[in-house]
């Protein structure tokens, strides 16, 4: 027994409360070390004859990464408090693991040995907006989606799609163009639109904000935005805007005041300026996003800055009824600011979705007091490595994703913003070597996984493009130039997800362990007490026979993709043709 690999902490992703009153308790052990793990638990104050009374619960192995196994038990404490430990059994030995170490038997004379969940306080439970779990998002880069009003085109606007995207060219995309294509999004099955910034700025991407309180004139007016949001809401589509509170653009008036007046500017303490006069090149002598001199970093601990940015957050929720904020470079802004931001905007709209752009382990932001979710780039990376780069095996993918899933509580994973492409990454079809069959498999995984999936505009019709700015092509609206088969594939997957809650966030996800390093089939189940849906993806260019395992000797199975009914025997193999997939319900 490798005791040094056994780990638990009584908080965060290892011990957390759910809205239904359940406590989820996890423990980590060395991979393949334990035969079984049992949870020992009881109320903090219940004793019988001066001995603590406890119950036991079998813990289920919920996944394995390259080094560890993860185990879970769910209990509902009668009095909303719990003391607990673990009995670990490696086939040769059994021992009780507690907060104070290892013991041959569960200690009953002193509960201070045990881990403690002192009380389930409702205010401490992580709860993302319920509607998010059923939402399929669509990311729109407004300058490249559709030109609905040529009167607001900036000078030098190019004919739509006439050239490759460049860092500084414009094609006239605007909010009116989105309004004109709401029917397209509704037919696709989209439930939410994530817009990259629409506030006044000089660039085509608008991340260099000049005025946080104004719509960029090339996109329209505030009235246009109100019309857009109204049309979206009438069609069951949520709207999420993108804000940059880490830094402003260089032409943001307060920063321009500092440029002009130096240390005499009343705004000089709005930014992290190390010395005067300001130096912009080769490296600025003030803090910025990266070393980009045109993006000076806000000092959010300054009360004036904090109030200005908080009012930005409040204003667009209060006056325009937006449904979410996506927060750029969120990890470089203080936790204190985000806690206050959450309180302020949720006071106006409690079910507002707050999404942070963070590329690494994000648990410190996901404790229920800051964000509802972060952009799930670890999932993106693993999907790209499996299907596009083909640099990891199915076994490695399962291990990597098991690690990611167990980094967070299940309640966090359900609201994770899952994506395979964005304005910051090469087009997913390009990364797949323009192999549409591989891209279809990517969409199968994206749209049947836990979390809330997002499609980058045009990926559903096969747009291609390299790294930024190549990934920001104009949307193709000519049906003859769209990959209609791919579009229908994505539509059908979204419809299946909508019709089958298990394909979204109901139930439990479990990976089926690959047979070996060469196994080309990725398989996982989504299950509840009533039924199971199994997704099998053959990423090989050859047909394979996939062995099926059921609890019963014979099982009636429905293929949800083609509605075919099958009667299969336990242990029977199922043929998957090259690049094929199955979505089986039983």
Curated annotation (Swiss-Prot):
| EC numbers on record | 3.2.1.133
**In this chain's numbering, which residues are marked as the site (Transition state stabilizer)?**
424
Q: From what superkingdom does this record's organism come?
A: Bacteria
Q: List cofactor names only.
A: Ca(2+)
Q: Which InterPro entries match?
A: Glyco_hydro_13_cat_dom, Glyco_hydro_13_lg-like_dom, Glyco_hydro_b, Glycoside_hydrolase_SF, Ig-like_fold, Malt_amylase-like_C, O16G_dom_2
What's in the keyword line of the UniProt record? Calcium, Carbohydrate metabolism, Glycosidase, Hydrolase, Metal-binding
Binding-site positions, substrate: 247, 326, 423-424, 468, 472
Q: Where is the active site?
A: 328, 357
List the SMART domains: Aamy
Name of the protein in its database record: Maltogenic alpha-amylase
């Amino acid at each position: 027994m490798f005791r040094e690999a056994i780990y638990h902490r009584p908080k965060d992703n290892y011990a957390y409360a759910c809205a239904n009153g359940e406590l989820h308790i996890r423990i980590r052990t060395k991979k393949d070390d334990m035969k079984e793990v049992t949870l020992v638990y009881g109320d903090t104050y219940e004793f019988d004859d001066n001995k603590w009374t406890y119950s036991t619960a079998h813990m289920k192995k919920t996944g394995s990464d390259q080094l560890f196994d993860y185990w879970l038990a769910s209990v509902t404490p009668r009095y909303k408090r719990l003391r607990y430990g673990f009995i670990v059994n490696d086939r040769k030995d059994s021992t009780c693991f507690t907060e104070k170490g290892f013991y041959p038997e569960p200690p009953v004379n002193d509960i201070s040995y045990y881990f403690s969940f002192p009380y389930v306080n409702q205010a401490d439970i992580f709860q993302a907006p319920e509607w998010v779990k059923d939402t399929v998002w669509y990311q729109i880069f407004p300058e490249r989606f559709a030109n609905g009003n040529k009167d607001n085109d900036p000078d030098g606007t190019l004919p739509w799609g006439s050239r490759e995207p460049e860092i500084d060219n414009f094609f006239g995309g605007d909010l009116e163009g989105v309004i004109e294509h709401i029917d397209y999004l509704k037919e696709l099955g989209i439930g939410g639109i994530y817009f990259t910034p629409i506030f006044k700025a000089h660039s085509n991407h608008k991340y260099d904000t000049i005025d946080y309180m104004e719509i960029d004139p090339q996109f329209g007016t505030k009235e246009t935005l109100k019309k857009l949001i109204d049309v979206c809401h009438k069609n069951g589509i949520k709207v999420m805007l993108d804000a940059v509170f880490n830094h402003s653009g260089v032409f943001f008036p307060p920063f321009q005041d500092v440029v002009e007046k130096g240390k005499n500017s009343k705004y000089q303490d709005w930014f992290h300026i190390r010395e005067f006069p300001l130096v912009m090149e080769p490296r600025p002598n003030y803090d910025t996003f990266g070393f980009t001199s045109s993006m000076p970093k806000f000092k959010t601990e300054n009360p004036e800055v904090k109030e200005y940015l908080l009012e930005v957050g409040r204003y667009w929720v209060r006056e325009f009824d937006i449904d979410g904020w996506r927060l750029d470079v969120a990890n470089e802004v203080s936790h204190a600011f985000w806690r206050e931001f959450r309180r302020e905007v949720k006071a106006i709209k409690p079910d507002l979705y707050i999404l942070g752009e963070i590329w690494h382990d994000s648990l410190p932001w996901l404790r229920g007091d800051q964000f509802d979710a972060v952009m799930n780039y670890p999932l993106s990376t693993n999907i790209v490595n499996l299907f596009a780069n083909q640099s990891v095996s199915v076994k490695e993918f399962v291990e990597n994703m098991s690690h990611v899933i167990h980094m967070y509580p299940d309640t966090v994973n359900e609201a994770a913003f899952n994506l395979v492409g964005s304005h910051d990454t090469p087009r997913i079809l390009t990364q797949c070597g323009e192999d549409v069959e591989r891209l279809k498999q990517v969409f199968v995984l994206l749209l049947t996984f836990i979390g809330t999936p997002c499609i980058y505009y045009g990926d559903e019709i096969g747009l291609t493009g390299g790294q930024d700015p190549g990934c920001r092509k104009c949307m193709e609206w000519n049906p003859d130039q769209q990959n209609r088969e791919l579009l229908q594939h994505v539509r059908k997957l979204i419809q299946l997800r909508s019709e089958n809650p298990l394909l979204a966030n109901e139930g439990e996800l479990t990976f089926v362990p690959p047979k070996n390093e060469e196994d080309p089939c990725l398989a996982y189940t989504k299950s509840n007490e009533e039924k199971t849906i199994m997704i099998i993806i053959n990423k090989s260019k050859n047909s394979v026979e996939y062995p099926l395992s059921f609890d019963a000797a014979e099982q009636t199975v429905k293929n949800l993709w083609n509605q075919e009914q099958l009667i299969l025997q336990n242990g029977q193999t199922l043929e998957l043709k090259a690049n094929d997939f199955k979505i089986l319900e039983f």
